[in-house]
């Protein structure tokens, strides 16, 4: 396969469950996830990551760049991007919930929206969907891939469990 260009870009999203911290065992789990899934980009939510976070993970240290958008509450976002991809035009929100960047004419995004069913939380999500994200996406590429932990609440009355093939909410 030498000399051939990779035809598929593997993009994954993973919530690290920040309340449990990011001890070395979990760092190795992230590294194994990247290896097993052959990830080119791994978007993380509930992350508090700095330049030293993965220093014990040789594969990540050698092959990935880290873009982090930490939050005061330690529930931020981060994106691990393979070193052979040229990242441009990085933009983040001020609360650690959004990372947007471009690679080779494509916009990529990592979102971690507020959770909860109370009025403040719902209003926060609506503000991201209706105002913040559209503003961040102005002048971006016409093609893109954006995802993450959107913390959208499913109304069980409108969508009974039979529609989710055993997935529990």
Per-region residue spans from a language model:
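Short, flexible loop segments at the rims of nucleotide/cofactor-binding pockets, characterized by
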Residues: 16-23, 90, 121-126
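Active-site-proximal beta-strand elements of phosphoester/diester hydrolases
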Residues: 8-19, 103-119, 147
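Structured beta-strand-rich core segments of catalytic domains in phosphoester-bond hydrolases
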Residues: 41, 47-116
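Internal catalytic-core helix/loop-beta-alpha segment
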Residues: 93, 97, 101-102, 123-137
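Hydrophobic anchor at the start of a short beta-strand
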Residues: 11, 87-88, 143-144
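N-terminal, active-site-proximal structural segment of metallo-dependent hydrolase catalytic domains
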Residues: 1-57, 75-77
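Surface-exposed cleft-lining segments at the edges of enzyme active sites
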Residues: 112-127, 161-163
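Metal-dependent phosphoesterases centered on the DNase I-like endonuclease/exonuclease/phosphatase
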Residues: 32-44, 49, 53-67, 127-169
């Amino acid at each position: 396969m030498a000399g051939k260009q990779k035809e598929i870009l593997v993009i994954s999203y993973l919530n690290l469950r920040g309340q449990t911290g990011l001890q070395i065992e979990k760092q190795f789990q992230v590294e194994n996830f990247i290896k097993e899934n052959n990830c080119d980009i791994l978007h993380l939510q509930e992350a508090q990551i700095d330049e030293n976070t993965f220093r014990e993970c040789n594969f990540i240290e050698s092959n990935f760049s880290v873009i982090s958008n930490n939050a005061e509450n330690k529930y931020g976002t981060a994106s691990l991007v393979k070193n052979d991809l040229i990242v441009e035009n990085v933009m983040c929100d001020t609360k650690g919930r959004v990372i947007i960047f471009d690679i080779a004419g494509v916009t990529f995004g990592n979102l971690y929206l507020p959770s909860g069913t109370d009025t403040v939380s719902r209003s926060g999500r609506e503000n991201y969907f209706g105002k913040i994200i559209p503003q961040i996406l102005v002048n971006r590429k016409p093609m893109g891939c954006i995802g993450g932990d959107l913390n959208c609440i499913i109304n069980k009355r409108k969508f009974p469990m039979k529609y989710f093939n055993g997935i529990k909410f």
